[in-house]
Amino acid sequence: MNEQEQALQELKIYGFTILKSVVDADTADAMRETLIRCAEEHGTEHTHRGAARHVSNLPVLDRIFHQCIDHPRVLPLLEHFLQPSLILGSLNSRIVRPGDGYQGLHSDIPVYMLNMDTPVMMNTVWMLDDFSPEIGGTRVVPGSHKSGLGAP
């Protein structure tokens, strides 16, 4: 089973998958530095579902984020589930800092739109830093994409 086949299987069963090293270390460093600059210039404080620094519309702020839109290892996974109606809704950043605490578990899909048979949206998360006890990590509930619940 190749990477794409395994990722598709994990998405169907668990609702998420992990693709390692989608960008190389130098690109991740450049994206991180650019994101820090964008956060300083354009970021806002968000407390919705937990404290964090939020930066909206990243591709408009810097071309380095364009690769997140159509990366050849990521886009085919989205296309598999969302064709022919694939639309980029947003490309934003949620920067969790030491002391920001946990974000509450939630679905990004409004409850009235939840559909366990056909996905109506998918998110990609681009981790530019390693997880650590200070900043934590993204929490997921395996299988919750089939639960029909707005907050697993």
Residue ranges and their predicted role:
Residues 1-14, 19-116:
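Non-heme Fe(II)-dependent double-stranded beta-helix
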Residues 100-152:
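Catalytic core of non-heme Fe(II) oxygenases with the double-stranded beta-helix
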